[in-house]
């Protein structure tokens, strides 16, 4: 198909080339010449004059076409006839020329046509091949572009699908979260209502508990008074029992003495008159010397007074006769007390208690006393400090402590600051620090400037007793952050 098209196109080019190289001229003799140029070859034809042309009968025939003046209708018809005759003559002449050319130039034209056709065919084939190659290349490029566009379109469709899926998921999550928020709001409203109801019930319960607490406090007060009475009766019974034992012992000695005297004929019949037995005691040493050697609670009398106070007497440690002025063992008693309470004493002699600064001051102001401090830690170790001279000044001197002559195993340096320090409580600050040691360290003590000891500090149980600045401490034995398990402070006369 392409070859036929190229062949036809080549033949048209040959004819066009032939007619384009066709020239007409007149020689010197007046004869007409026709020259044909085909490539490097040139062909000249001499043609005879045509004698069959019609003669013009009108004066306007020769130049009828070139006239510019207006003519009437008859002149126009004549002119058209003349033109038709001329056109017919020219047509005949051309036909003759064509026949002549065909006869004379047939062979050459055939060869020329063949050469031209071959050349043009080769060129056309080459052009066609090039066009085919270019078309194929363009087709491949178009195919590649289509593939790329298809891939890009597919990728975009996948991304769009993924975005659509993600959007659907997000919308679902938003719906779920909105639903959860609504549920939480409903639950929150329910809980708020429940909290309000619980607050109301709690207020009622608190009011009821307050009333019960008041009733329990009244009951505890009554029971405390009953317990105090029972303790008094127990102490009285103990003292009476001890006195009965002593009287029985004295009676047995008297009976034995009488029996001895009666069995001896040379003995004088006289009976010794015994002194009146002492029934009041200044301290536990006097009780011990009276023959009462059992540790327990006894009644002591203030010096130069009939006022009495209960104290625990230790008749076992170091020969006995010790009056216990302080004891800590389980944290059952709060030692963060006022000045008045430390002055008069508090707690129970059977457990944790403070005997009272006023009694100790009056007692140690009349005779020379020694002070022994016993300490226990949470690991089962024990230590003590013994001062061979101890006394407290009066209230006007803030019960200032005086100590000398330290011995013992609880440190070679006294953990109670010397010279004497004033006593301080939470409501009476007499220390040498602007920080109020009693409020910061807890309890009443001879703090000096929040010094190295405080046996009346906060009680801490085991495993909670380390790194406690406000605990029961004795610096020169266990350090400042160790809170002890038990402490006892006791005194007796130096000449016991």
Swiss-Prot record:
Entry binding sites for Ca(2+): 429, 431, 433, 435
Domain Fibrinogen C-terminal, chain residue ranges per copy: 275-495
Gene Ontology CC annotations of this record: cell projection; extracellular space
Tissue: Expressed in the ovary, uterus and placenta.
Subcellular location: Secreted
GO molecular function, one term: metal ion binding
Xref: Pfam families: ANG-1, Fibrinogen_C
Glycan-carrying positions: 89, 119, 133, 151, 240, 304
Database matches in InterPro entries: FIB_ANG-like, Fibrinogen-like_C, Fibrinogen_a/b/g_C_1, Fibrinogen_a/b/g_C_dom, Fibrinogen_CS
Subunit annotation: Interacts with TEK/TIE2, competing for the same binding site as ANGPT1. Interacts with ITGA5. Interacts with SVEP1/polydom. Interacts with THBD; this interaction significantly inhibits the generation of activated PC and TAFIa/CPB2 by the thrombin/thrombomodulin complex.
Function of the protein: Binds to TEK/TIE2, competing for the ANGPT1 binding site, and modulating ANGPT1 signaling. Can induce tyrosine phosphorylation of TEK/TIE2 in the absence of ANGPT1. In the absence of angiogenic inducers, such as VEGF, ANGPT2-mediated loosening of cell-matrix contacts may induce endothelial cell apoptosis with consequent vascular regression. In concert with VEGF, it may facilitate endothelial cell migration and proliferation, thus serving as a permissive angiogenic signal. Involved in the regulation of lymphangiogenesis.
Protein name per Swiss-Prot or TrEMBL: Angiopoietin-2
Native organism: Mus musculus (Mouse)
């Amino acid at each position: 198909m392409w070859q036929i098209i190229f062949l036809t196109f080549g033949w048209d080019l040959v004819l066009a080339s032939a007619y384009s190289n066709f020239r007409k001229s007149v020689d010197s003799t007046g004869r007409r010449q026709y020259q044909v140029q085909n490539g490097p070859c040139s062909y000249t034809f001499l043609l005879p004059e045509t004698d069959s042309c019609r003669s013009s009968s009108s004066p306007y025939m020769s130049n009828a076409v070139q006239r510019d003046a207006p003519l009437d209708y008859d002149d126009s018809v004549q002119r058209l006839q003349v033109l038709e005759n001329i056109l017919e003559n020219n047509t005949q002449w051309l036909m003759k020329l064509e026949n002549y050319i065909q006869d004379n130039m047939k062979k050459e034209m055939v060869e020329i046509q063949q050469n031209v056709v071959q050349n043009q065919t080769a060129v056309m084939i080459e052009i066609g091949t090039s066009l085919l190659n270019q078309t194929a290349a363009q087709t491949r490029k178009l195919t590649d572009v289509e593939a790329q566009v298809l891939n890009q379109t597919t990728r975009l469709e996948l991304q769009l699908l993924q975005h659509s899926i993600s959007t659907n998921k997000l919308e679902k999550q938003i719906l779920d979260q909105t639903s959860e928020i609504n549920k939480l709001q409903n639950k929150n409203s329910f809980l708020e209502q429940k909290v309000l109801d619980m607050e109301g019930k709690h207020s009622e319960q608190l009011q009821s508990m307050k009333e019960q607490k008041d009733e329990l406090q009244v009951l505890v007060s009554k029971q405390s008074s009953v317990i105090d009475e029972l303790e008094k009766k127990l102490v009285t019974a103990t003292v009476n029992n001890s006195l009965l034992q002593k009287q029985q012992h004295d009676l047995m000695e008297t009976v034995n003495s009488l029996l001895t005297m009666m069995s001896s004929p040379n003995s004088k019949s006289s009976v010794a008159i015994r002194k009146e037995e002492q029934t009041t005691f200044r301290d536990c040493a006097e009780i011990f010397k009276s023959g009462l050697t059992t540790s327990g609670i006894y009644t002591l009398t203030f010096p130069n007074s009939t006022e009495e106070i209960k104290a625990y007497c230790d008749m076992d440690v170091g020969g006995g006769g010790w009056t216990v002025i302080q004891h800590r063992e389980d944290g059952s008693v709060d030692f963060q007390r006022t000045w008045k309470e430390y002055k008069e004493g508090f707690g129970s002699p059977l457990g944790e208690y403070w005997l009272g600064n006023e009694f100790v001051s009056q007692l140690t102001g009349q005779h020379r006393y020694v002070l022994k401090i016993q300490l226990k830690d949470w690991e089962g170790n024990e230590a003590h400090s013994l001062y061979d001279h101890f006394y407290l000044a009066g209230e006007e001197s803030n019960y200032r402590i005086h100590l000398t002559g330290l011995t013992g195993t609880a440190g070679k340096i006294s953990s109670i600051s010397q010279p004497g320090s004033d006593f301080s409580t939470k409501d009476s600050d007499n220390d040498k620090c602007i920080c109020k040691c009693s409020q910061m360290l807890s309890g009443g003590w001879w703090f000096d400037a929040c010094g190295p000891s405080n046996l009346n500090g906060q009680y801490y149980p085991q495993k909670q007793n380390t790194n406690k600045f406000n605990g029961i401490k004795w610096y020169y034995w266990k350090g400042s952050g160790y809170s002890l398990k038990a402490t006892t402070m006791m005194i007796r006369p130096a000449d016991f």
